């Protein structure tokens, strides 16, 4: 299920993005400040380049690039 980013409370969205950008394997040795990484993800969401996907089985949200989202979720 796709969740519109603007349907989330601002603080909830920020925590989701921060969780994503601080996960193991996402920094790749990048020394970019957390605020900058959060801003980049927020911009990708507003441009429709990234989407929030909710998995009802695991009851978890994840951020995905639009081209990586399973096609059936767009139906």
UniProtKB/Swiss-Prot annotation:
<comment type="similarity">
    <text>Belongs to the UPF0270 family.</text>
</comment>
<dbReference type="InterPro" id="IPR010648">
    <property type="entry name" value="UPF0270"/>
</dbReference>
<dbReference type="InterPro" id="IPR036685">
    <property type="entry name" value="YehU-like_sf"/>
</dbReference>
<protein>
    <recommendedName>
        <fullName>UPF0270 protein Pfl01_4103</fullName>
    </recommendedName>
</protein>
<dbReference type="Pfam" id="PF06794">
    <property type="entry name" value="UPF0270"/>
</dbReference>
